[in-house]
């Protein structure tokens, strides 16, 4: 059972209560705090589009504490972040692993952050398939194409040579907040809100 806190605000019209995520959205804050899947991607894409419609010139802040998840779902979020007009600032709180790390790096350059004790993990895509040999071959080819695409984007986002990213993502590669900064996944480690 998931408990979502409620915030009560006093206005000149009386009291108004919001669930905490709706209240944060009012301040242009989106939380990715679970596995990336079709449901979370749809919610985040909708929030990004809503905030762009509200004010296309004001930054959006995406807080990430995620173990990663589906590549296609993550790419829907990534593409939307690049598509919309407002800059999307990303902030790692806790852990940004796999697709979570990819989305962290996808934030607007100069506006990608991590809290001091957060951790980032990059690796190659995971997948599995059962079936006929021909179908297994088709899926293996697809995952290799995805691996190349993800590594190319990470290389662009970090400034690291593609060969280095390919080597570093071959296995689980854990980085502290400072190491993530040195790697180019984030721009700054922050301990106080600006």
From Swiss-Prot:
It is an enzyme of class 3 (hydrolase). Its EC number is 3.4.21.92. InterPro entries: ClpP, ClpP/crotonase-like_dom_sf, ClpP/TepA, ClpP_His_AS, ClpP_Ser_AS. The active site is at 98 (nucleophile), 123. One of its GO terms (cellular component) is cytoplasm. One of its GO terms (biological process) is protein quality control for misfolded or incompletely synthesized proteins. Its main location: cytoplasm. Cleaves peptides in various proteins in a process that requires ATP hydrolysis. Has a chymotrypsin-like activity. Plays a major role in the degradation of misfolded proteins. NCBIfam families: clpP, PRK00277.1, PRK12553.1. Belongs to the peptidase S14 family. This is ATP-dependent Clp protease proteolytic subunit. It comes from Clostridium botulinum (strain Hall / ATCC 3502 / NCTC 13319 / Type A).
